[in-house]
Amino acid sequence: MGLLPYKQRCFNINEAHLDDEVMTSCFRILYTHFNKLGINWGPAFSSLIGIVRNDGYLSWANNLCIYILKEDEERFKDELWAIIADGFEVIRYERRGLYYLRKDKQYIKIFILRKIASNVRHTGGSDFIFEQYLQDTTKWEFRGMIMFLQS
C-alpha cells in the first residue's frame, strides 16, 4: 500500500473536550473497523471505567483510550488507510506503541500492549495489564455496540 502520509502536529490534548455524541460516532466507526479485522481490542483505562460504571464517558475525560495487542498491530496499521478514509487523522505516533487519532476534534489514544512476561502486558509507558484480564472477557453492550470487555 505504500507509505502512510503522516505529518506530526502540535496539539494540546489537555485542552480537548470530549463531546458525548461526536465521540460515540467516532467510536462506532473504529468499532466497525476493528471488528472487521477480528483482532483483540477494547476500551482501556478511564474509558473502560466510564463505559462500565457510567454507561458513557467520564465527565473529566478528554479522549477515548483503546488497547490493541501487539500481535494485531500490523493488521491495525494496514487498516489505517481505511480509517483515514473515514475522516480520522493520525496526529501522533510513538514507536513504543501509542497512536493518537483525531476526528471532529475528538481524540483517541490507541495503546499497543506488548507481552513482557507470560502473564503481563505493557503499554510502553507506565501501565501494565495482566494477560488474564484481556483473555477472560465479559460481553457488554454499549450504545448498540457489542464488545467483550476486560473482566
Feature-to-residue mapping (PLM):
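Catalytic cores of NTP-dependent nucleotidyl/adenyl transfer enzymes across multiple folds
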Residues: 2-6, 24, 104-151
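Active-site nucleotide-donor binding segment shared across nucleotidyl transfer reactions
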Residues: 31-64
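Helical scaffold of the NTase/Pol beta-like nucleotidyltransferase catalytic core
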Residues: 1-44
